[in-house]
Design a protein with these regions (language model features):
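Extended, helix-rich architectural segments
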Residues: 1-220
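Structured, contiguous alpha/beta core segments that scaffold functional sites
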Residues: 10-21, 28-29, 154-328
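Long amphipathic alpha-helical segments
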Residues: 75-101, 105-113, 123, 256-257, ...
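Generic detection of long, well-ordered alpha-helical segments
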Residues: 109-116, 129-133, 284-296, 356, ...
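Short, intrinsically disordered, mixed-charge
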Residues: 128, 297-300, 368-371
Length: 426
């Protein structure tokens, strides 16, 4: 864990306070720039991924989150697309990457090729041993729903990797002039006990004080990872590594801990991205959101209409001679013999088939946004030959070609580079 454990001594002098204040001011500007995205993400989460609906409002753990859902088409479609991309790009059952030398002359040397194959085998073993598969699936799901995923890669003790897909609500992104994300501010909460364990003797005075009072209280921490422009490249100390890693106590406005990374530890892929929008991407869930909201409203209305037909409102004479009315199964209601007054259901003239037909149209539009028909083509049919399987896979790859190209540049390539470099330092 070479890049993470070499730390500089924290200081409460004026320079570090000014640095902390400057970084927090930058965070404030990034928060303002992200406000419009948060409303959009909240809408998407409410209707398509309720378990992550914590942007403009938060709920306690275990709270019900499906109140707005009357139809689960979008939920299932998003899960299908994210699982399909997972299977195409980083399936645990296949070798999804190969290493090669940039120097073609080395590719012709058997000993060099054998060494590279050994490195590749070691990397696969580390990926399988780690939590990569569970975390990368969450990343793909974030891409499909929110348009932006954030994956953090660090070392796991002395050997191996550890991955963490971070909720986009915690992360504030900034790009370099080429449009690549090179700065991540993470604003999150952790218990005082966890903070004390993470920072040790370097913890701020507030953390040390709270540790004695209530170690289980949650506090806010800001973690900044950004390029270090003022470093001395000839030195290998943590304060001269290419990327700065700075933990800040935002309440006291002090730097708790400062270290560095040899590579950018975050992979921040975007599903689709407009050239004029900075930092964050757009998703098929955003494209389908109007249809999703309309379908939910249609389903709600259709359910109410069907309920009125199955258990219709009752028409009673205004003199109320039958009261009290018993509407339970087998209930007896008495009225005077010979009277023409009757207890009758109200005929509402509902047209449920039309409502169901319109719902199917919206479902088809949602499925089209998530490529459901193309991804499920041939599923449940007769057994396919190996050639047919390859042909179907290639068809899916062509369908998602533009998206997969962006993921290769923003996710897979930096991921492999980061993991390879971690192994070379161990």
């Amino acid at each position: 864990m070479a890049e993470e454990i070499i730390d500089v001594e924290p200081s409460l002098n004026e320079d570090t306070k000014k640095t902390a204040t400057k970084l927090l001011d930058r965070l404030a500007s990034l928060e303002v720039a992200r406000e419009s995205w948060e409303e959009h993400w909240q809408d998407v989460a409410d209707y398509i991924v309720p378990r992550k609906a914590d942007f403009t409002r938060t709920r306690s753990a275990g709270d019900k989150r499906m109140e707005k859902i009357y139809d689960g088409t979008a939920i299932h479609a998003s899960e299908l697309l994210s699982a399909s991309i997972h299977g195409m790009l980083t399936s645990a059952s296949t070798n999804w990457f190969n290493l090669c030398f940039m120097n073609n002359d080395l590719q012709a040397i058997d000993e060099a090729k054998e060494w590279l194959e050994g490195v590749e085998h070691t990397m696969y073993a580390q990926f399988h041993r780690s939590n990569f598969q569970e975390q990368i699936h969450e990343l793909y799901h974030d891409l499909i729903t929110f348009g932006t995923g954030v994956l953090y890669v660090e070392t796991d003790g002395e050997n191996g990797f550890r991955f963490e897909t971070r909720h986009i609500s915690e992360c504030f992104l900034a790009e370099d002039p080429e449009g690549r994300v090179d700065t991540v501010y993470r604003k999150y909460k952790m218990s005082v006990r966890s903070a004390q364990k993470l920072f040790g003797e370097e913890a701020s005075s507030r953390i040390n004080k709270l540790m004695k009072q209530d170690p289980h209280e949650e506090i806010e921490i800001v973690h900044v990872v950004m390029p270090r422009d003022d470093r001395d490249a000839e030195k290998i100390s943590s304060e001269n590594k290419p990327y700065a890693s700075i933990y800040i106590d935002p309440e006291e406005k002090v730097i708790i801990k400062e270290s560095g990374f040899d590579e950018f530890p975050y992979m921040c892929p975007r599903y689709l991205k407009a050239s004029f929008e900075r930092g964050y991407g757009r998703s098929p869930a955003m494209q389908a959101l109007p249809d999703v909201k309309m379908l939910n409203k249609m389903s709600e209305v259709t359910i109410r209409s069907a309920e009125k037909q199955v258990d219709p409102p009752l028409m009673l004479p205004d003199d109320g001679f039958m009261l009290p009315i018993r509407t339970v199964p087998g209930g007896l209601n008495f009225y005077r013999s010979g009277t023409r007054d009757r207890l009758e259901p109200l005929q509402i003239g509902a047209n449920n088939p039309l409502g169901l037909q319109m719902e199917d149209q919206r479902r088809q539009a949602i499925n089209s946004a998530f490529y459901v028909d193309q991804l499920t083509m041939g599923v449940g049919g007769p057994m396919m030959t190996a050639t047919e399987v390859v042909a179907r896979t290639e068809e899916k790859m062509r369908l998602l070609g533009p998206v997969l190209g962006r993921l290769q540049a923003e996710l897979l390539q930096p991921l492999i580079n980061r993991c390879y470099n971690i192994l070379t330092r161990q």
